[in-house]
């Protein structure tokens, strides 16, 4: 199981563990504002906040483990095997593949309040990125600089 922690002094720090014995080839990844994000269920997004984080890049797509956007909103996908369950696509919901959740959210939201509103109609699906990268069993930690305890 992965863990995460925050620390606020005059600045805001966010850290996490990645509890794997090996690397997928993850690297520090920057996604600029106008990078054309394609999603499995949503329309492509051409205008969005810039993102920086740790990701495994597959087929020119950043599969973020954790990241923050230029507004200070951060998210991490933490391993939670046996406790995270995702379903199939649901009609009437905003469907988001688990592998796309972090960039999908950080591209659109500048704060936790914005994220809460956006997430009210979201269905995270078990749709894999591709045949060799199935949906991971994660829970997500969402943080924002002004939401940290003083």
Label the predicted regions.
Residues 1-94, 126:
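A contiguous strand-loop segment
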Residues 35-36, 89-122:
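Compact, glycine/acidic-enriched structural inserts
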Residues 144-150:
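Conserved small/polar residues in nucleotide/adenosyl-binding loops
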Residues 71-73, 102-103, 136-140:
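Generic beta-strand structural signal
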Residues 59-60, 97-98, 134:
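Short, glycine/acidic-rich beta->alpha junctions
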Residues 116, 122-143:
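Aromatic- and glycine-enriched pocket-lining scaffold segments that form the walls
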